Amino acid sequence: MEISWGRAMWRNFLGQSPDWYKLALLVFLIINPLTFFTNSFVAGWLLVAEFIFTLAMALKCYPLLPGGLLAIEAVVIGMTSAAHVREEVAANLEVLLLLMFMVAGIYFMKQLLLFIFTRLLLSIRSKMVLSLAFCVAAAFLSAFLDALTVVAVVISVAVGFYGIYHRVASSRGEENDMLDDSHIDQHYKTVLEQFRGFLRSLMMHAGVGTALGGVMTMVGEPQNLIIAKAAGWHFGDFFLRMSPVTVPVLVCGLLTCMLVEKMRWFGYGETLPEKVRNVLQQFDDQSRKQRTRQDKIKLIVQAIIGVWLVTALALHLAEVGLIGLSVIILATALTGVTDEHAIGKAFTESLPFTALLTVFFSIVAVIIDQHLFAPIIQFVLQASEHAQLTLFYLFNGLLSSISDNVFVGTIYINEAKAAMENGAISLKQFELLAVAINTGTNLPSVATPNGQAAFLFLLTSALAPLIRLSYGRMVWMALPYTIILTLVGLLCVEFTLAPVNEWMTQAGWLATLS
């Protein structure tokens, strides 16, 4: 018997999301207009809380859908205007171009990145050194590339290696289902569990590495570019101004990586089983023998394009998104990718998040129009200049650990810039606050997958169920990093940021403030 029209519509609404989630969103959509016409300030904060809820529940439904419905309703009832949303999008066009073109550009360099991580995995036998190598490699790559892409590459390596061993363990060849362990002997299952633990720890080290490297440069994370644009900084300026905080944090993050591996704390310390290593080594040897001269040329070309990418970013030869577009053109033209559909696949990773970011800007427009953050900013600005840095760092860190750091960073940098333009703070103080905001959004946000887009991407990937990486386990494994990164970042903002920036200005490394 066919279901009723109403039931069919209910099932279609937000698809496979739980019924309670669908009901919650409908309640939000009903109460928002009623609240807005009663008290617009309360309604604005209600909308922000609801939007953060959709980000926190990203595993139930991709936030673009519920967040988009809330944003559309906000425009319709007059919480903001379509014109203001367009202004916010136009002001942040560079960030959208970064996500569209840079992520797609790096997609065409995946062969080189896969080659690098495969070499690391098979050539380093010490688990501590290997973990450190993955963390450092992810940090370095994330300083110049998008963190999502770096994590996507490491996921590709892990899924590939897991699949190779799982096929051998199940003896089912190409028909093997990686989610099905029923055909695997108990002995192989024990080895497989150890392999899962090994991959979990490597993925977490790589994920944290993207945060350690991503905070250091203006292209490492989308919000970095928003903050850099607001402060008028180029690539070199951004790196130098962040370094009093980011360099000590990087060192302490790497020491944490070594410590948790050595002590086998928080689920770390599993080594690569020798039986698995032998299987993977045989497969890699076979792959290398089958690599043609054409394949080798592709790797060389991708390496040269990588050098161009780093050089162009460091010298600020063009806007970040346009440099990404140049990578797409060079990588496709010189490696023979000419089919439209093959090129189109490169954009599938970035466009949903680009659309979600556009929805963020709609919520930001509401925050500006309804003056939602005015009381918080006034409270912070009443403190001494030194205390302002700590408060901005802590407020950003708290919100970023439960919400998306792009959203939080955008809100706070806009408010800080408005305070400077209104004469509430000096240009010098604004630039220090920009560092506090950037580090506050990037470092404590490793606490949960909600805060870091790369972590959320890992949690929702095909790899997570294979290696038994749940939300709770991810939070637990991130805990030592969360504590160390947050505390070291806070101490650096408190004690080293202002004096080191002053010293660099006097040394002529930074432009003298007018």
Swiss-Prot record:
It comes from the Bacteria. The chain crosses the membrane at residues 23-43, 52-72, 97-117, 120-140, 144-164, 202-222, 238-258, 303-323, 357-377, 391-411, 447-467, 475-495. Pfam families: NhaB. GO terms for molecular function: sodium:proton antiporter activity. It is found in: Cell inner membrane. One of its GO terms (cellular component) is plasma membrane. It catalyses: 2 Na(+)(in) + 3 H(+)(out) = 2 Na(+)(out) + 3 H(+)(in). It is a multi-pass membrane protein. Its main location: membrane. InterPro entries: Na+/H+_antiporter_NhaB. Keywords: Antiport, Cell inner membrane, Cell membrane, Ion transport, Membrane, Sodium, Sodium transport, Transmembrane, Transmembrane helix, Transport. The keyword Cytoplasm does not apply. Na(+)/H(+) antiporter that extrudes sodium in exchange for external protons. Belongs to the NhaB Na(+)/H(+) (TC 2.A.34) antiporter family. This is Na(+)/H(+) antiporter NhaB. It comes from Salmonella arizonae (strain ATCC BAA-731 / CDC346-86 / RSK2980).
